[in-house]
Each structure stands twice: as C-alpha cells, then as structure tokens.
C-alpha cells in the first residue's frame, strides 16, 4: 500500500452542537455501528472485531447492527440521513462506498454525505467452488466454466458487492458468461456454496479457509500477487494459470455528514488505538487482512483514497454494464 497525499478538509459543526460541546463530547449512551450487509460476512466479522476495542477507548458500548439489502444502499441511506451527533456511524467497504455509486441511483452522495473516519484493512479473495466440482485446479476449473458457458452459476454478496464485480471481471478474463446469483451477504453465499446450490464464488479467506479445512468446498487460487501467509499452500492466480487477474477490497468507517470534526477525531482515535492493539491486529491478520499503516488511517487519507478508487473503478464498472436489477 502507498501513502496518500492528503489535503486539509474543513468540516462544519452540526446543528445543535457548539465547538465546546463537540470538543468535550463524551458519549452518554450506546453508539450504533451500522453494518451494511448481513451477518456472517467479512464486513460483519471485522465490525465485531473492532467494536470492543473502540468501545473501550470511547468509554461507551458500541452496538453492531446489521442493515442489509440493495448492495448496502439501505444502510447507506440510513447513515447518510442520521443525526450527526456521534451516536451513529458505519463500517463500509469498497462495494458499498465505491461500486454502488456506479450501479445504483442513490439518495445520497458517497463523497458529500459522509464524514470519513478512517481506513481499517484490505484483503484479497479466494476463487472457490462447490465440493463436487469436477476440477482439481484452476486450469481445469476454467475449462469447465468454458464448457458450461451461460450455465455455470456464480454466487455473490449482492449487486455491486466486491464478489459481484470480481465475478464480472473473472468472466471477462476467462471468456465466458456466468449466471450471476446475488445473495444478501457473504454468509448466505457461503451457505449456498456449501449446499451446492451454486457452482463457484469469490469469497474471503476468513470465510473460505474453514470450509476448505472441513472439506466442504474446493479452493483454487488467491486473487493477489503474493500467497497468503496463513495459507501458503494456495497458489496465486498468476501461479494457477490466470495471469494478471487480481482483486482486493478494503474496509473503513464513516459518519453522517455534519458530524463535528472533534467527534470524528475521537472516533478516529478509537479506530487508531484499537488497530494498535496486538490482540486486534492478530485477529485481523489471521483473517488475511492487511492493516493500513498508521499514516493512512486518518480521515483525510480515507477521503483521498476513496475518491481515487471511485475515479479508477467507476469507468470499469460502467463499461462492464453492471445493473442493479
């Protein structure tokens, strides 16, 4: 990961909170962390890893609430229109806070209607298939997909999700048309794969490695340039026969637009302190997460990074003709 040049961004105070009140803000009731996807996926898992540490720093309970549906846009609208007082913020990721803007007609603006809090970590996917898939390596899987053009099914976590866009790019790289099957999150997609209701999916190491060890699925490659430290036996896509196919996605926190800078800074401090805890770092690394360096965990760095990702990916997504329905 690279360091990002950042610009100073002034953030106005929300109505009803003075400078002094914001500076001295100490939460007096539970804080809600909105998760824009269903339980069981990597976004939910990361949220539940981060919440206890941030609660400790802030001195108040953080309640994790899953608000799934429509690629995360239901949760996005809720947080965008929430009272900007520090008691509601969201975890999001590349799909919910980049890709959705190129696919859905949103009631909010991804860059203008949120205050960035900070980046957390990034991770690759694993290319996985149902247990009964008659392919023992990625080359054989690609041959099977080509032989089953327009019939092979690819599950994903919802339209515009990282797994959906990664599947769209996979079919382009392989030269086939996959039947896309959207679910309400990675948890449901995983259940469908284990239940052999779909042929393949792209899923996170955090979810897939357990099923691989239990013999419930087949794993073919990791979508990164390097092998995973926690699973060095899994080849990269380059090594497995699909050169130049890479995909990773990241997670971060956002607050509603107008949340006072002093409160955003306190939430960011809770993020930074939690990510500095060895126990938290170990849990994330064990899930194949690459934690962003300290200098890239600031609100300003997230704003710059998110905009750069929008500039990079929107043309690709639109060119792929990805639709919300």
Give the positions of each predicted feature:
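Hinge/capping helix and adjacent helix->loop/strand transition within the periplasmic-binding protein
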Residues: 81-87, 102-188, 200, 237, ...
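An extracytoplasmic/periplasmic, membrane-proximal ligand-sensing/linker region
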Residues: 28-30, 261-325
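Short coil/turn segments
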Residues: 40, 94-95, 130-135, 156-161, ...
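Beta->alpha turn/N-cap motifs
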Residues: 91-96, 156, 186, 203-208, ...
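Periplasmic-binding protein-like
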Residues: 120-126, 221-257, 294
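N-terminal (or domain-start) structured segment
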Residues: 22-113, 151, 175-204, 211, ...
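Bacterial N-terminal signal peptides
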Residues: 5-16
């Amino acid at each position: 990961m690279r360091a990002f040049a950042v610009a100073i961004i002034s953030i106005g105070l929300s109505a009803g909170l003075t400078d002094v009140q914001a500076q001295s803000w100490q939460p007096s009731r539970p804080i809600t962390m909105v998760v824009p996807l269903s339980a069981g996926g990597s976004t939910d898992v990361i949220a539940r890893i981060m919440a206890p540490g941030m609660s400790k720093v802030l001195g108040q309970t953080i309640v994790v609430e899953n608000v799934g549906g429509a690629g995360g846009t239901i949760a996005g609208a809720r947080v965008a229109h929430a009272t900007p007082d520090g008691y509601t913020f969201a975890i999001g990721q590349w799909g919910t806070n980049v890709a959705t803007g190129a696919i859905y007609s949103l009631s909010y603006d991804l860059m203008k209607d949120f205050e960035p809090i900070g980046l957390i970590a990034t991770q690759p996917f694993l290319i996985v298939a149902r247990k009964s898939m008659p392919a023992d390596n990625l080359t054989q899987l690609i041959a099977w997909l080509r032989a089953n053009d327009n019939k092979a099914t690819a599950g994903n976590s919802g339209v515009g999700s990282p797994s959906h866009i990664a599947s769209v790019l996979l079919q382009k790289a392989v030269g086939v048309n996959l039947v896309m099957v959207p679910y309400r999150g990675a948890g449901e997609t995983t259940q469908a794969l284990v239940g052999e209701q779909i042929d393949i999916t792209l899923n996170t190491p955090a979810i897939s490695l357990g099923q691989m060890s239990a013999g419930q699925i087949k794993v073919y490659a990791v979508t990164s340039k390097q092998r995973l430290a926690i699973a060095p036996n899994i080849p990269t896509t380059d090594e497995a026969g699909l050169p130049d196919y890479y995909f990773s996605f990241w997670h971060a926190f956002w607050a509603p637009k107008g949340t006072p800078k002093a409160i955003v800074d306190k939430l960011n401090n809770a993020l930074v302190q939690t990510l500095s805890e060895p126990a938290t770092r170990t849990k994330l690394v064990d899930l194949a997460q690459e934690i962003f360096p300290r200098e890239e965990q600031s609100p300003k760095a997230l704003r710059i990074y998110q905009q750069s990702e929008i500039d990079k990916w929107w043309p690709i997504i639109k060119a792929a003709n990805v639709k919300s329905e």
